[in-house]
Design a protein with these regions (language model features):
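Glycine-rich phosphate/pyrophosphate-handling loop used in enzymes and phosphotransfer proteins
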Residues: 1-163
Length: 163
């Protein structure tokens, strides 16, 4: 690390987006306490799980996995609200980096040839100005060393999954 980087971290310390505690030097996105409190999913395998079956009905994929269960009023829900509705794009990238790092730690990165974010409708993209799935995928891809490609086209508007 450069001296400038170290000075910047001293003057502008990074904080955990959940509890606002100052991140330790080894903590990249979330503090260890908050990361350990996320409702993790360790699926039985990436070749036979609910996520894969769900996606296969929409688009052919060989492998799929999910790291965190979505639950209303959980810290993870609060993070997604900040990303989607408070334009916290930096948080999206950081959360993606965390997820990608966890995938690498679990050895799941060896199965990934490409990460494909789910697209927004043109109207939603205009309203929001960014695709949070793309930002999450960019962070994951960077951590995993895997390219991100936009290969899907949104055909219809669905309902919000976070409300």
């Amino acid at each position: 690390m450069s001296i400038l980087h170290d000075i910047t971290r001293l003057l502008l310390p990074r904080r955990c987006p959940v509890c606002q505690r100052r991140l330790e030097y080894t903590e990249q996105s979330l503090c260890a306490v908050c990361a350990s409190c996320l409702p993790r999913l360790w699926l039985p395998g990436i070749d036979d799980n609910d996520m894969l079956r769900h996606l296969w009905t929409r688009v052919p994929v060989e492998h799929a996995f999910s790291l965190v269960a979505y639950r209303h009023n959980s810290p993870f829900h609060q993070l997604l609200m900040r990303i989607k509705y408070q334009s916290d794009t930096a948080l999206a990238y950081r959360l993606g980096w965390w997820a990608g790092s966890e995938a690498v730690r679990a050895g799941l990165d060896e199965y990934a040839d490409v990460l494909v974010p789910v697209p927004l409708t043109a109207r939603r993209l205009r309203e929001r100005g960014y695709n949070q799935a793309r930002l999450l995928a960019d962070g994951m891809g960077r951590a995993m060393g895997v390219p991100v490609m936009e290969l899907l086209v949104r055909q219809q508007q669905g309902t919000s999954q976070t409300h």
